[in-house]
């Protein structure tokens, strides 16, 4: 009963939730129904708290729908569903024993032995594992926001249960959004939990260079042993494998060996796996075997939080209105924000002047002028029209077909996000529409970005194009 009831609930939740959310939070849950109590087992405290906070009402609604007045009590626990007691083995007769002992040795197959995370990997004497994990990048100095929330949650779960949570974990998004920080944070957390763990971080080009050197020095077997003996392999910018057939071939076999051994793989890219050109389909397919999560450009609140955190790290007081002023004007990525703040702080140190909005405007005048020149409502309209292969006139027209209305709503939302224009000004620029129409468009796109992978991708792509 517990399995069928929870299976029904899961099927409905899968229909209602975005695929990434369902895979990350609901799929790992196990259920047991006992004495009219349905216990849901979560793999760790983080998942338990998240599910209880975000999905409790939905689960209770479905239980009431399926059970009516006999709705079971709902409990949450960290752990796994208790295993059923094994059935007693049948009594073996002397004839059975004799038959087994007389069977040919090759037919007495051994079960494959898989490496578990708690096993101590045998050290390879002739290979010195170079971690390359940056100790400065930790989870506690990664600023969380809606744009990176799922990626951060997945990274934490992998760090808590490497090889067993999501394998591989594939993070993708534009430059400077925090993917590399998360890779290092996972590596640091794994080593903190298990100091003798072999964790290797590298850029994909380093993998290629190592393989070329191994081939030149007739040391390809050592190369294979090195990469296949790690506990966690963290590879940045996997898209640089494009058109490198020999490297892809070797990585394909390394990937398979690590997964078979329950060794963790985390990959990052600037685009969704299937969109990486020049990479074999069999590799792209494997990239999606675990969990694939988008890291999006930070929204305004996250940009402000990043600036405040970085200023605190520099022991600099940054007024809220100053942080908001910078964050409102620099939108593309975290790296750009940090660079701008470093420039402001350096100017303040050189001149001894307090950091005010006027001072920031002066210190960043060329950067701000470039940004304002690049992102205008006119530019947004042209970019969106080109992206969706429609005319700018369509965006300004009264047409309501979805092929026009959705791009129009996206363009309005982008204008609100990327410019300093008011809602009435944006509405006026879109064929004289009312400000309430613009507000509705912004809210609709925000909702669709949560529900639709395609809309989320389109929005991120347009942000990157307009901010680059």
From Swiss-Prot:
GO terms for molecular function: ATP binding; ATP hydrolysis activity; DNA replication origin binding; lipid binding. It holds the Pfam family Bac_DnaA. Residues 132-348 are annotated as: Domain III, AAA+ region. It is found in: Cytoplasm. Keywords: ATP-binding, Cytoplasm, DNA replication, DNA-binding, Lipid-binding, Nucleotide-binding. GO terms for cellular component: cytoplasm; plasma membrane. Its main location: cytoplasm. Residues 1-84 are annotated as: Domain I, interacts with DnaA modulators. Residues 349-468 are annotated as: Domain IV, binds dsDNA. ATP binds at residues 176, 178-180. GO terms for biological process: DNA replication initiation; regulation of DNA replication. SMART domains: AAA, Bac_DnaA_C. Residues 84-131 are annotated as: Domain II. Domain I is involved in oligomerization and binding regulators, domain II is flexibile and of varying length in different bacteria, domain III forms the AAA+ region, while domain IV binds dsDNA. Belongs to the DnaA family. Oligomerizes as a right-handed, spiral filament on DNA at oriC. Plays an essential role in the initiation and regulation of chromosomal replication. ATP-DnaA binds to the origin of replication (oriC) to initiate formation of the DNA replication initiation complex once per cell cycle. Binds the DnaA box (a 9 base pair repeat at the origin) and separates the double-stranded (ds)DNA. Forms a right-handed helical filament on oriC DNA; dsDNA binds to the exterior of the filament while single-stranded (ss)DNA is stabiized in the filament's interior. This is Chromosomal replication initiator protein DnaA. It comes from Vibrio vulnificus (strain YJ016).
């Amino acid at each position: 009963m517990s399995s069928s009831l929870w299976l029904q609930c899961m099927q409905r939740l899968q229909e209602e939730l975005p695929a990434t959310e369902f895979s990350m939070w609901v799929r790992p849950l196990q259920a047991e129904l006992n004495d009219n109590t349905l216990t849901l087992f979560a793999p760790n405290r983080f998942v338990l708290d998240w599910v209880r906070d975000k999905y409790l009402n939905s689960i209770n609604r479905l239980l009431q729908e399926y059970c009516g007045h006999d709705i079971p009590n709902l409990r949450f626990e960290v752990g796994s569903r208790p295993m059923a007691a094994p059935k007693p083995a049948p009594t073996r007769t002397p004839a059975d024993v004799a038959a087994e002992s007389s069977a040919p040795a090759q037919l007495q197959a051994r079960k494959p032995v898989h490496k578990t995370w708690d096993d101590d990997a045998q050290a390879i004497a002739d290979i010195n594992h170079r971690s390359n994990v940056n100790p400065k990048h930790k989870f506690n100095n990664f600023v969380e926001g809606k744009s990176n929330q799922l990626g951060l949650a997945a990274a934490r779960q992998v760090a808590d249960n490497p090889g067993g949570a999501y394998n591989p974990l594939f993070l993708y998004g534009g430059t400077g959004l925090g993917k590399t920080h998360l890779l290092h944070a996972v590596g640091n957390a794994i080593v903190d939990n298990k100091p003798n763990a072999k964790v290797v971080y590298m850029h994909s080009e380093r993998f290629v260079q190592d393989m070329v050197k191994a081939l030149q020095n007739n040391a390809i077997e050592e190369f294979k042993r090195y990469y296949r003996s790690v506990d966690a392999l963290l590879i940045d910018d996997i898209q640089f494998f494009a058109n490198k057939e020999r490297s892809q071939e070797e990585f394909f076999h390394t990937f398979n060996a690590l997964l078979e051994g329950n060794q963790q793989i985390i990959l990052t890219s600037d685009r969704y796996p299937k969109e990486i050109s020049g990479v074999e389909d069999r590799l792209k397919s494997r990239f999606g075997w675990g969990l694939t999560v988008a890291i999006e450009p930070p929204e305004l609140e996250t940009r402000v939080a990043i600036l405040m955190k970085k200023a605190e790290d520099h022991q600099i007081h940054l007024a809220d209105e100053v942080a908001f002023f910078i964050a409102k004007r620099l939108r593309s990525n975290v790296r750009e924000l940090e660079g701008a703040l470093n420039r402001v702080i350096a100017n303040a140190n050189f001149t001894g002047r307090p950091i005010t909005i006027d001072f920031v405007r002066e210190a960043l005048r060329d950067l701000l002028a470039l940004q304002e020149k690049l992102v205008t409502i006119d530019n947004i309209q042209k970019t969106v029209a080109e992206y969706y292969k429609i005319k700018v006139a369509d965006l300004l027209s009264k047409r309501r077909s979805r092929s026009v209305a959705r791009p129009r709503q996206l363009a309005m939302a982008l204008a609100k996000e990327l410019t300093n224009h008011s809602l009435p000004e944006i509405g006026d620029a879109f064929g004289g529409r009312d400000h309430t129409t613009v507000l509705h468009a912004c809210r609709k796109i925000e909702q669709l970005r949560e529900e639709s992978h395609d809309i989320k991708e389109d929005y991120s792509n347009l942000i990157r194009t307009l901010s680059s």
